[in-house]
Amino acid sequence: LYIAGLIFLAGCSTTKHLPEGEILYTGQKPMIVLNRSETSVGEIAMEEVEAALATAPNNSLLGSSTIRYPFPFGLWIYNGFQKYEKGFGKWIFNKFAATPVLMSTVNPDIRQKAAVNLLRDYGYFNGSVSYKTFIDPKDSLKAKLQYTVNMRNPYFIDTVYYRGFSERTTRIMELGRRRSLISSGEQFNVADLDGERTRISTLLRNVGCYYFRPDYLTYQADTMIVPNGHVQMRLIPVPGMPKVAEKQFRVGRKSVYLLGKQGQEPNDSMDYKGLTIHYYNKPPVRPNMLYRWLNYQGYRRKRQIQDSAGIARQRSMQSLYSLYRQTRIQERLASVGIFRYAEMQYIPRDTAFVSDTLDVRVIAALDKPYDAELDFNVTMKSNNQTGPGAAFTVTKNNVFGGGESWNVKLNGSYEWQTGKSSSSLMNSYELGISTSLIFPRVVFPRMGDREYDFPATTTFRLYADQMNRAKYYKLLAFGGNVTYDFQPKSTSRHSITPFRLTFNVLRNPTAAFDTLRAENPALYVSLRDQFIPAMEYTYTYDNASVRGKRNPIWWQTTVASAGNLTSAVYRIFGKPFSEKEKNLLGAPFAQFLKLNTDYRYLWKIDRNNSVAARIAGGVIWTYGNSHVAPYSEQFYVGGANSIRAFTVRSIGPGGYHPEKSEFSYLDQTGDIRLEANIEYRFRIYKDLHGAVFLD
């Protein structure tokens, strides 16, 4: 029956039920591109032109305009089952039939005009697009299209003038010209022209012009004044631009409306340093914190002052409205994480705009006080260990009324051996608890008004973990740390841990572990009871977000130091640095210096091809009170983000290759790490990409 059905469908014509005068579109022949431009703007232009001209036919392969499956099942069903109005045949039609893609639906004339407009948007004013229709010689009701794109030479910007603005507005625009997105010699590009309108609007709004918008700016272009493919540009205000657009406004009274838990309107208020706070029954946020988040004078940058120098000499620039400050305040309220929503309103003192003052009103509602999260996972390891894990986290938001959050996390995992031999049955487990208190600011040391200029957090953390390795040992680890994270620039992130203390306790070692210890003393030293008092600093650089950065860089470096301050205290009391086995609370403490770095570079060859390279390395040097680095601080390689052909801890160090056993991974750590990856990434078709890599 199945074979008979296929034969029946194959016998159906795909053009049997086409409307009168219609032609079935069967795809495109490869596009012809003449005088292709190799500039980056030209690549973007061609990508958009290709997207505008692309139309997938029936039975297309992955949405391709040129490649199709050999069997048009959807069309066969459309033509074979169109006659059914009910029953099983109608169900088949509704589920599997494909409506024919008609040439009139593709409408190549409209697509041709759209493609020409796209070429002009990117400076190819003399570019052209044409197409040909190829009728199928076997069926005159089927046809393909082939487009020809002739890009020709692009036009370039000659000069850009500002005309038709007030003297003050023109002066502001001239002061900001050095940051212009369009300049002499660059290729004409509508995207950059739109970006320039937004930039100038932002510049004006940063010096008080609250009502200015990018839509109030337009361009006039002249290609006749300067020959040989150059455009003279004039940026002018649109006809009918309201006068209030160029008027500077200052900020007046500031007020906050904090809604109740159920959305109740405020029923009480208070004043704090000129900030009026309206609340329901009881203030949910400390007044001093609201003042810090909304302090209009705190969000200030030097560049803004330089750009506006000499513009308004009779009044303080700090009282002017600034889009930059508004954005920073909104980002600050969002980053605190305690508000369900927060809306800023700027209200003029009078509707006729006689007054130049805007009052600021913030309406906010707090989020839920508690969050809970439950995670499950199942792990399968190459040493025949399998088992489930779970973690449960409860977070209390806005603990002290200043955006702080406190969380408690419980985690556990259980593993058993999956080998066939019951005599080797081995069960391991791990249990842990941790608690963290996170402040959305730098708590100590205070960093002055710069604290308002960038995101910053302070984290206090305590934890305890019990790990059981059946037949070998139990390891108890507990400790805590204080970490400061802040990002002064979009490309730079700093993390400072001035205090990190870990205490490892080796418990219940078995005879099997004693045997292993005799064979590998370094392993025992790395696992024995010891304190790890450490300090750590991490710097991360990432310029992927920088506009126009074609080949981004990501670089992270971490420096950690352990035991040096403790050893210095002992030195004060007479014990030399070189003395070994000094104890802290009855246990030796680790002393080492650790450096770890990771550098990544992405080279974009063109829009479809790129090369990604990575080199990473690290070294840990033990000295003073330590012979061997703690096991938790040693390096290992392998896994999805490392040497991808090997699982974690299953390769090295160096050429070392231990005997195969379920515990061989314990040895495969080292004091020095150097690894590199290079990967060629390419586009196969549309959103389908491939890569070839070497680790």
Show which residues each predicted segment covers.
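Acidic/polar loop patches that form or flank catalytic/metal-binding clefts of enzymes
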Residues: 213, 341-344, 405-406, 492-494, ...
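Interaction-mediating elements
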Residues: 13-335, 340-344, 357
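Gram-negative/organellar outer-membrane beta-barrel architecture
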Residues: 169-172, 305, 314, 319-556, ...
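Sec-dependent signal peptide recognition
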Residues: 1-3
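C-terminal outer-membrane beta-barrel translocator/porin domains of Gram-negative envelope proteins
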Residues: 270-280, 377-383, 495-683, 692-693
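Amphipathic hydrophobic-ligand
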Residues: 124-129, 210-215, 386-390, 431-433, ...
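Generic beta-strand/beta-sheet core signal
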Residues: 236-238, 257-259, 282-288, 336, ...
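C-terminal motif of bacterial Sec signal peptides marking the signal peptidase cleavage site
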Residues: 8-11
